[in-house]
Amino acid sequence: MIKLMKYLKKSAGYIVLIIALLFLQAYCDLSLPDYTSKIINVGIQQKGIEDSVPDKLRDSTLQNLQIFMDEDQKKEVSQNYTQEDDTCLLNDDISKETRENLNEDFSKAMMMVAAFSEDSEQGQAMAAQMGLPEGTDPLTALAQMPEEAVQQIMSQVDERLKDMPESIVTQAGVSFVASEYEALGKDVDAIQMHYILMSGIRMLAMALVIMLAAISVTFISARVAGRLGHDLRNSIYRKVMSFSSREYHKFSTASLITRSTNDVQQVQQVMAMMFRIVLYAPILGIGGVLKVLNTDSSMTWILGVAVGLILIVIFVLFQVAMPKFTILQTLIDRLNLVSREILTGIPVIRAFSREKHEEDRFEKANLDLTKTNLFVNRCMTFMMPIMMLIMNGVSVLIIYSGAHAVDNGTMQVGNVMAFIQYAMQIIMSFLMITAMSIMLPRANVAALRIDEVLKTEVSIQDPETPVHPSESVKGEIEFDHVSFAYPEAGENVLTDISFKAKKGQTIAVIGSTGSGKSTLINLIPRYYDVTKGSVKVDGVDVRDMTQKELRDKLGYVPQKGVLFSGTIDSNIRYGKPEITDAQVKEAAEVAQATEFIDTKPEKYESPVSQGGTNVSGGQKQRLSIARAIAKDPEIFIFDDSFSALDFKTDSQLRKALKEYTKDATTVIVAQRISTILGADQIIVLDDGHMAGIGTHKELMANCEVYQQIARSQLSEEELA
């Protein structure tokens, strides 16, 4: 996958936006447990009162609190409260830091006031110890005591407070503030409801932001992944179009189709999910860990155990399943190959009654793929139940440990709830990565297969400084001591072939099956590079010309007629779209194609199906010839292109073609002697060697191989 990352450069801006949205989504996701905790701790348990800093309190209460404050604390309180009648109001513009200081000042003082009130056991004990008359407030007595005595009492209390959980101190301060509000006539229930309502509204706002961020990330991810798929398909197409025949043989057609469709689709799907899940999971997981550490670090060991178990499960499963992921795409290739062979060979299969054999071949390929898929899926089915077991076990363990912490006063119920939610978010982040890990290995294999195509070195490339043929020389072909062997083949297919064809000449190539006829003419358009010697067109070595300039000079008709989906007109115009309708008709007339075109209702606009399956072999061949004629090239190459024609059509076509191509060079590969009798030069190939060259008459006189071919096809009267 990493090798294909360069194709994401165009979408760098979108990727940055996705990451920003994911951080926003994670922030909101991680904020929700905190709000839940606050609703339970503050909204329910503390009646909506957040801390020990009262917004309003009576003068008498403040005086009692100041008994247990030092001079600095008293000064800070007086600076942040304003006197109004017999009450004190908290200033509106205090900072967060100041409020925290006031909370610390008030919490301890409120505990002391509550402890020494005349209703408390400690207050009654102190009154008895000091011999105070019944009904005397101990706080009044404390106010009259020397400051040293009060500070001594405070020191003793501080020692006790050190061992007391912070939550108990907070609860005591909040209870004091609630009592003070009730004494002032404030509606504490309204305060509680307002806090819960506002917290709920904030949570709804967070949920809305999460939804919008998730939708935006999904939309942008799909766009980026779609562009990646588009660019990969384009790159594969351009690369494949630059392949020589050598590279085509390296990859089968079925494999190239799979790589440019199925493999690209795999990468595209995983990339879309990767932005939404793989990037989001670590953001959420790390954020959850940080939140957990802030909530209560005493239970983080539970998360450590959970994460360790998850990693062990993933490691074991992937050690078992990973080898199968690697061969999965190869098996898909195999199934595509078998399917393609069967579908294209149905007539032959039926003719030889081999349906059962082909059914067995398909069944084997299908069964191999099915077994591998089942094995992988069975491995992965264990993953989710095990993960859910770990998740539920962690929840139970957190509740058990949290209950003890709540009972000991070291943790609040809301914090336990928040811890559970954070733990679930951390585990869910691992679950998301685990879910992706099912697709990632397969997508990685697909990416490697795509990269294999894109990284393939093309054996036939344009020269850095191309040579342009002279305008004075056109249509000239020269083979200069050419030898050729297929890549990785031990023997030459062609050996020491030399001949020269000039403008206006017709060169024929004949020989037995496998003698190298098609290979010879495939060297002219440079489908292969020669092993030795050189092939020249218009006096320039084809290796020194650009492939486009070379092939623009050629009109090539392959041995097997190839048509493209469209119309008859579009197929004839294929090599030169700008030609006129009259030129299209002329090309069809020369190719003897008007005979069947004119019988069709739509004539030249008649549809041609993919591969030309709705026309006969002879019609397909004639349209292929018309396509080459319409291009009006300098050189015509016919690779046994008349074999599908009847003798009458063959004769008429050759007669019309001779007149039309009189100013062009024509190279014909033929099996029938009658097709090439009038050629200016006939090259006779025998097992890759040139057995003879000359006219029909000359070869009949001095070439034994040609004589054998001629006598096997024609009678002595026809040869005379």
Task: Label every model-predicted segment.
Residues 146, 153, 245-246, 262-271, ...:
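An intracellular "coupling" helix at the cytosolic face of ABC transporter transmembrane type-1 domains
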Residues 44-51, 58-65, 70, 138-146, ...:
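Short intracellular "coupling" helices and adjacent cytoplasmic loop segments at the cytosolic face
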Residues 287, 291-308, 312-314, 318-319, ...:
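Helix-loop-helix
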Residues 15, 51, 66, 71-72, ...:
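ABC-type nucleotide-binding domain
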Residues 25, 29-33, 205, 210-225, ...:
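Alpha-helical transmembrane segments
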Residues 217, 242, 249-278, 300, ...:
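Extended hydrophobic secondary-structure segments
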Residues 22, 207, 277, 281, ...:
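Residue-level recognition of pore/gate-forming positions within transmembrane alpha-helices
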Residues 1-32, 36-203, 209, 213, ...:
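Membrane-integrated ABC transporters
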